[in-house]
Design a protein with these regions (language model features):
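Extracellular/periplasmic juxtamembrane helices and adjacent flexible linkers that interface
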Residues: 2-4, 8, 41, 172-177, ...
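Ligand-binding pocket segment of bilobal, Venus flytrap-like solute-binding proteins
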Residues: 86, 187-276
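Extracytoplasmic ligand-binding site segments that recognize negatively charged/polar headgroups
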Residues: 129-133, 139-227
Length: 364
């Protein structure tokens, strides 16, 4: 296999879709969702959300950028993990959630308790590779296929110079050093997407299925959130972890085996992969994690914002609409791309999101 630098694909990621059929009320406030979000003169006060720590860099840019269209709106976001974000949204603590995994059917049903009969919906906020990042001084561009990655993260392969790794890296001097696996300690959409890749692409080498909480049977180190795992891996010689690629920092990253090539992560092909993927009746997107397509990076997440179709009061509806319109606008997507290195959503995805967002209204 040869190294190939480019893009990505793969994963079953649900975009929940009550939004496709719900929302019959009028457009209360909000802009036209254009190049910069259109503006919303009715939006003011503080909008509170929480969720995926992978969104933290982009969220910082969005919180600042939304001021260009809603100068009196302040956005607060707690990056405590996707699971915590969805829980906080469903408990009424947050007006919106950021999540690297969509709500399941039970969560969608529960959303009616805070959102009314029309429930909640998902909008893709950005698309990002999941980097398999490691700390091994002087060793760059290690290649691994899916089976090898699964065996490393399950603890079956324990040394960096293991024969299975070495045979994929001819000419690269790998040390006789223990591998320390670092995983997320919290409920994590990044964990769910990473283990979904292992489940689909690695076959019997991964025995733990797709999970949001890392399997307790695996001996490994753990840390809270994206910053936590990157920080711990950076401080641990011989460590390997998985993280939103925008947060990988100075860690080296694995080139992932796809078909007859090894692919380094990049964002170029990400949005196109989503556009070309199959969409289920409920609005979920089925990405092919086991793809062998040339130049595709198969370890990927689509990060969502979760909103109510209807809010309990007009002020919150105006706040959410102004923020949501900015996030999916050309300016919002460009701002996130520049600050976080993610792939912007496509024009088709943006237009579909704008149609859903403009129908956000107040209950009653």
């Amino acid at each position: 296999m040869k190294a190939f630098r480019v893009g990505r694909s793969a994963a079953l990621l649900s975009v929940a879709a009550l939004a496709l059929t719900a929302c019959s009320s009028a457009d209360n406030g909000g802009g036209n969702g254009g190049e910069n979000g259109g503006g919303n003169s009715n939006a003011s006060g503080t909008l509170t959300g929480g969720g995926a720590s992978s969104q933290e860099a982009a969220m910082t840019a969005w919180k600042d950028g939304v001021k260009s269209v809603a100068s009196d709106l302040t956005v607060q976001y707690s990056p405590d993990g996707s699971g915590a974000g969805r829980e906080g949204f469903l408990d009424g603590q947050f007006s919106f959630a950021g999540s690297d995994a969509a709500m399941d059917e039970e969560e969608l049903e529960k959303s009616k308790e805070v959102c009314g009969d029309k429930g909640a919906f998902h909008v893709p906020a950005y698309i990002s590779p999941i980097a398999i990042a490691y700390n091994l001084e002087g060793v760059e561009g290690i290649k691994m296929d899916a089976e090898t990655i699964a065996k490393v993260f399950s603890g079956e392969i324990k040394k960096w110079n293991d024969e299975q790794i070495q045979k994929q890296n001819e000419g690269l001097e790998l040390p006789d050093k223990d591998i320390t696996v670092v995983h997320r300690s919290d409920d994590s959409g990044t964990t769910e997407n990473f283990t979904a890749y292992l489940t689909e692409a690695a076959g019997d080498a991964w025995k733990y299925d797709e999970v949001e909480v890392w399997p307790g049977e695996i001996t490994a180190e753990s840390a809270q959130g994206t910053k936590g795992v990157v920080g711990l891996a950076s401080d641990t010689d011989g460590a390997i972890t998985y993280t939103d690629a925008s947060a990988a920092g100075d860690l080296n990253t694995v080139h992932v085996g796809v078909g007859e090539e090894y692919v380094e992560y990049s964002s170029e092909a990400a949005a196109a992969v989503v556009d070309k993927s199959e969409q289920n009746e409920d609005g979920s997107i089925k990405l092919d994690r086991a793809t062998e397509e040339e130049g595709v990076y198969p370890v990927v997440l689509v990060s969502y914002h979760i909103y109510c179709n209807e809010y309990q009061d007009q002020k919150t509806a105006d706040q959410v609409k102004a923020f949501a319109e900015y996030v999916v606008s050309e300016d919002g997507q460009k701002t996130a791309e520049e600050s976080a290195g993610n792939a912007p959503i496509s024009e088709d995805t943006r237009k579909a999101a704008q149609e859903r967002i403009k129908k956000i209204s107040a209950q009653g």
